């Protein structure tokens, strides 16, 4: 039986609708495996996996693939930036009780700046997970510091939305906080002066520094310094120079004194 005009018209619309259906973002098995491996490494879970993937989705990928249901990571980056500032501020406030507002601001700026966040993202292999457009890929976007720093922030934003602030603190305890404690950002701070002020203000006694060890070949020397207060070692630090080792030792001493004050 020949099809009526209406039936032919309806069938034509069905084909058009099928053709116009929005594309969906589908991860390859390898990409899915990489995301799973990341969560295992960080000992984290995501209830909403779409948020996790969004954190690694660059705007160039969305624009190139025209996937309607797929969002880029820019809004998550905006949120993550604020969450990261709060989490780092709280850590500094608690760990360095004697530090002035101005010094905390300087130290925080050195921690959440682009080079620092890009390095952290690189250490976590975030670049390998980013969904990029071909143009961005060809121009080396996967290794671009600005892009990596943005992804670190968007990941923090996604983690906050999915799991809350406690999960963010746990993540930072495995990534940023140990580096602060180890003095990775201490080139921005004069911890020796801060320690001296702290000791004098509270009349705790007299401190002195001792280089207790030198190790490594002459061209790659490493020094170990102790800072001692009234015959008690308050902090130990290492560095490529005696001054750097003393700065790191002073930073450890400040953390020790802050913890003692809380007890």
Swiss-Prot record:
Mg(2+) binds at residues 77, 150, 153. Its cofactor is Mg(2+). Residues 1-23 are annotated as: Disordered. GO terms for molecular function: double-stranded RNA binding; metal ion binding; ribonuclease III activity; rRNA binding. It is found in: Cytoplasm. Residues 190-259 form the DRBM domain. Signal peptide: none annotated. GO terms for biological process: mRNA processing; regulation of gene expression; rRNA processing; tRNA processing. Keywords: Cytoplasm, Endonuclease, Hydrolase, Magnesium, Metal-binding, mRNA processing, Nuclease, RNA-binding, rRNA processing, rRNA-binding, tRNA processing. Homodimer. Digests double-stranded RNA. Involved in the processing of primary rRNA transcript to yield the immediate precursors to the large and small rRNAs (23S and 16S). Processes some mRNAs, and tRNAs when they are encoded in the rRNA operon. Processes pre-crRNA and tracrRNA of type II CRISPR loci if present in the organism. This is Ribonuclease 3. The gene is rnc.
């Amino acid at each position: 039986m020949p099809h009526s005009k209406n039936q032919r018209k309806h069938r034509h619309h069905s084909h058009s609708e099928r053709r116009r259906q929005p594309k969906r973002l589908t991860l390859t098995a390898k990409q899915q495996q990489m995301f799973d491996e990341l969560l295992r490494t960080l000992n984290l879970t995501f209830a909403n996996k779409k948020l996790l993937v969004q954190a690694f989705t660059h705007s160039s990928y969305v624009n190139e693939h025209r996937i309607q249901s797929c969002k880029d990571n820019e809004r998550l980056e905006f949120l993550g930036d604020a969450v990261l500032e709060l989490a780092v501020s709280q850590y500094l406030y608690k760990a360095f009780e004697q530090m002035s507002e101005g010094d905390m601001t300087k130290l925080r700026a050195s921690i959440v700046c682009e080079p620092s966040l890009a390095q952290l993202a690189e250490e976590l292999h975030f670049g390998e997970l980013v969904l990029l457009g071909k143009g961005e890929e060809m121009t080396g976007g996967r290794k671009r510091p600005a892009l990596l720093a943005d992804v670190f922030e968007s990941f923090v934003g996604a983690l906050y939305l999915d799991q809350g602030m406690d999960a963010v603190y746990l993540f930072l305890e495995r990534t940023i906080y140990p580096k602060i404690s180890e003095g990775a950002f201490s080139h921005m701070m004069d911890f020796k002066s801060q320690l001296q002020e702290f000791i004098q203000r509270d009349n705790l006694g007299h401190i002195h520094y001792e280089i207790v060890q030198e190790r490594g070949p002459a061209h790659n020397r490493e020094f170990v310094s102790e800072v001692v207060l009234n015959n008690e070692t308050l902090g130990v630090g290492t560095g490529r120079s005696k001054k750097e080792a003393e700065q790191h030792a002073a930073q450890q001493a400040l953390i020790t004194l802050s913890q003692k004050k809380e007890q």
